[in-house]
């Protein structure tokens, strides 16, 4: 389980002011009060979305403000309501009041929608103050102040892609090339002592795609029985949507057969007993800048016979990196589209169903 966090400030719109106005038209003597009410301020709304999987956007854009309501007008016209702001968050996001630490909401299911900061009520115009004994009121109300909150968002991330393979297969180097993650990298086994997380972005706005990659610490023969760094890391693989199985085809590994390397790790995944080995898999030959040609050819042939997607890359030179990034993006998107329930694990307390409001007119993704 990985944790992403962001702190934001949200400000709902203030209500518009009511106004003082009187009806002055020909042939309408003593027209009376005609001042309209102010419009309601816009709300700040949060909605859970399957198409979002990190909080990275909120870290770079920490402030959100809804539009204030317009002031009332003559002819007893109510001011226009302020435009709501819609913030889309990943399923699994927890929303805390950053000042009190109170948990305000947990988004457990897709398409949950809550008002996190409510807009201020519009003030009353003088027409609202008219009575039989007070027929020309000159008082009105200002709009109410909209809610302002400082929030802490926390997301327990489930990786879309798990990078697996023997220690030193190049997983940490790859994740450092395709994302902003900076894991410890050195030329010895078990450099990675805990899963590293990276967010990969492909394409450009407004059509960019993102997915989460986990650099799972190196597995070895017997991992399913606790060997090496043990079963704890197999649990992380279990939660991914797609596996990228990295196989070193250089002579640096000291192992003669890359196909056997692939089979050993696949056997460990199968021995874990939760169907991990059945997940969609891409075979990735690594270190092709210093590849043993015979090893590369053998692994390529095996991948074709196994009808597995196959890519050959060098994280050092960058060869093959871009096609691999796009292939993973395409496959993750297809898996997400097919998923019936993207939340594999929910806490014991389910969020109550919320009443739907009319869709907000301004969306922040």
UniProtKB/Swiss-Prot annotation:
Enzyme superclass (EC):
hydrolase
Q: Where is the composition biased (Basic residues)?
A: 353-365
Cofactor requirement? Mg(2+)
Gene Ontology CC: cytoplasm
Q: Tell me the domain of life.
A: Bacteria
Could you give the subunit structure recorded for this chain?
A: Monomer.
- PANTHER family named in the record: DEVELOPMENTALLY REGULATED GTP-BINDING PROTEIN-RELATED, MITOCHONDRIAL RIBOSOME-ASSOCIATED GTPASE 2
- Which protein is depicted? GTPase Obg
